[in-house]
Every structure is written in C-alpha cells, then in structure tokens.
Amino acid sequence: MSPEQWGIYGWTFSHAVALGYPINPTEEDKLRYYTFFNSYRYVLPCGKCRINYADHLNKYPLTDEVLSSRENLVKWTIDIHNVVNYYTGKKMLTYPEAIEAIEKTLTPKKKSSYNWFFIILIIIGIIVIIYLMYIVFKKKLNK
C-alpha cells in the first residue's frame, strides 16, 4: 500500500501515542512503548517502509534516554518523522513547528455553523406545519 494512502494517519497516530506517554514512565511503561514502536518494522502497510523504518531504528534506537520521558519520546518521533521527510523531499520541522502541527492535527474540528442553521430551519418548518394543521383543523371544527 502506498504511503500516500496511510502515511498522514500513521504519523498522526504515532505522535498521539508519544504524547500519551507518561511524564514519569515506569519500567513497564518503557517496555510497552518500546515494544509498540519497535513492532512497526513488522506491521507498516508498505514493505519498503518496513525496511526503511528498521534502518531508522538501527540509526536512531529507542534507548533508555529516549524512553526516560514523554518529552524525549515525542522528540524521537519527530526526529524519525524528519528522517523520512528528508528522504522523501518533504520539509523537516523544528520541534516547536512539529509540536504545533501535531496539536493542530489532533485538535477536533469545530462543527460548521451551517449545522445550526439547518436545525433552526427544520424547527421553524415544523412549527409552521403544526400551525397550518391547527388552522385547518380549527376550520373543520367550525363547519
């Protein structure tokens, strides 16, 4: 499967997972996250990406230092993402730029005000229909 089909979602998920890493991780946390990120080399939906990710892990391993804090793990995911961006000719981001982009991506989109417009329009329509039914019913009773 082409990275263009799933890449943005994979990166968003990876960064979100890193942001969910404990600030002060336990040894169990470290092992679980190490296993999680290490397993990408076996499950990415692109064969070339699996090979490249394994190479990136060899060059930029998930060390005890990386796993010592949330900040370090988030920076590591940004570093790995930047390595991929370098090889794919995309812009590499500083940590502040990357964190801003990640937070923007993870921020829920506000619902359009058009939704409220249509809800109000439907309510007004229902009120008009009920009023017209009332007038018709009242005229039939008066006959």
From Swiss-Prot:
<keyword id="KW-0472">Membrane</keyword>
<feature type="domain" description="ERV/ALR sulfhydryl oxidase">
    <location>
        <begin position="10"/>
        <end position="104"/>
    </location>
</feature>
<keyword id="KW-0812">Transmembrane</keyword>
<comment type="function">
    <text>FAD-dependent sulfhydryl oxidase that catalyzes disulfide bond formation.</text>
</comment>
<dbReference type="InterPro" id="IPR017905">
    <property type="entry name" value="ERV/ALR_sulphydryl_oxidase"/>
</dbReference>
<keyword id="KW-1015">Disulfide bond</keyword>
<keyword id="KW-0274">FAD</keyword>
<keyword id="KW-0285">Flavoprotein</keyword>
<dbReference type="GO" id="GO:0016971">
    <property type="term" value="F:flavin-dependent sulfhydryl oxidase activity"/>
</dbReference>
<feature type="disulfide bond" description="Redox-active">
    <location>
        <begin position="46"/>
        <end position="49"/>
    </location>
</feature>
<dbReference type="GO" id="GO:0016020">
    <property type="term" value="C:membrane"/>
</dbReference>
<keyword id="KW-1133">Transmembrane helix</keyword>
<feature type="transmembrane region" description="Helical">
    <location>
        <begin position="117"/>
        <end position="137"/>
    </location>
</feature>
<dbReference type="Pfam" id="PF04777">
    <property type="entry name" value="Evr1_Alr"/>
</dbReference>
<dbReference type="InterPro" id="IPR036774">
    <property type="entry name" value="ERV/ALR_sulphydryl_oxid_sf"/>
</dbReference>
<dbReference type="InterPro" id="IPR039799">
    <property type="entry name" value="ALR/ERV"/>
</dbReference>
<dbReference type="GO" id="GO:0050660">
    <property type="term" value="F:flavin adenine dinucleotide binding"/>
</dbReference>
<protein>
    <recommendedName>
        <fullName>Probable FAD-linked sulfhydryl oxidase R368</fullName>
        <ecNumber>1.8.3.2</ecNumber>
    </recommendedName>
</protein>
<keyword id="KW-0560">Oxidoreductase</keyword>
